[in-house]
């Protein structure tokens, strides 16, 4: 009975997981079917754009070892997803803070979202085989675009841009999940210790 009560704590994280996955895939499929590769649409002037790009690799357009690396990366992602699932079950059993579980649900949703692209998109969209799909990215926030002064000792005269990486909903979910965990680390575990002490 106690175990069932603890696992109820995973209901909201599971809803968050499903919501992020659905939004991630809907946005990706829309971009994939309505934009041509490299197409860019300004949403908020030069600060926020939709820019359709694809990559074989990790979050924010980073790549890893070409096609052979793609298989390794996908296998690693699947192993990570299984580990996170097991960890969340264990954390819920230990009465982890709800926001802590939601944070891991965001990370899990992001990982699964990009795995779906990697495994299925190549075959579904007809450009490659299973496990060789490209991850669809679209959000581009070049918040700062400037030129480094000529009198600087390094990179003088070069263009500087922040934030350069193009990313997707899954990448954002992973990042938000990690940020919440890092910022709330002290609070999450202090709360758990207080609960254990009261028990």
Can you annotate each of these PLM segments?
Residues 1-199:
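Alpha-helical transmembrane bundles and membrane-interface segments of multipass inner-membrane proteins
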């Amino acid at each position: 009975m106690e175990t069932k009560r603890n696992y109820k704590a995973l209901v909201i994280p599971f809803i968050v997981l499903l919501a992020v996955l659905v939004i991630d895939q809907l946005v990706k499929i829309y971009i994939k079917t309505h934009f041509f590769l490299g197409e860019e649409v300004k949403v908020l002037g030069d600060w926020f754009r939709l820019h359709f790009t694809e990559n074989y690799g990790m979050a924010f357009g980073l790549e890893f070892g070409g096609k052979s690396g793609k298989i390794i990366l996908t296998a690693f992602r699947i192993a990570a997803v299984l580990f996170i699932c097991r960890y969340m079950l264990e954390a819920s059993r230990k009465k982890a803070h709800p926001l802590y579980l939601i944070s891991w649900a965001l990370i899990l949703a992001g990982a699964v979202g990009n795995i779906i692209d990697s495994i299925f998109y190549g075959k579904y969209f007809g450009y490659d085989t299973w496990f060789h799909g490209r991850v669809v990215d679209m959000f581009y926030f070049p918040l700062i675009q400037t030129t480094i002064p000529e009198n600087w000792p390094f990179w003088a005269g070069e263009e500087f841009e922040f934030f350069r990486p193009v990313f997707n909903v899954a990448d954002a979910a992973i990042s938000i999940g990690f940020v919440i965990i890092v910022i709330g680390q002290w609070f999450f575990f202090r709360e758990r210790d207080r609960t254990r002490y009261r028990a």
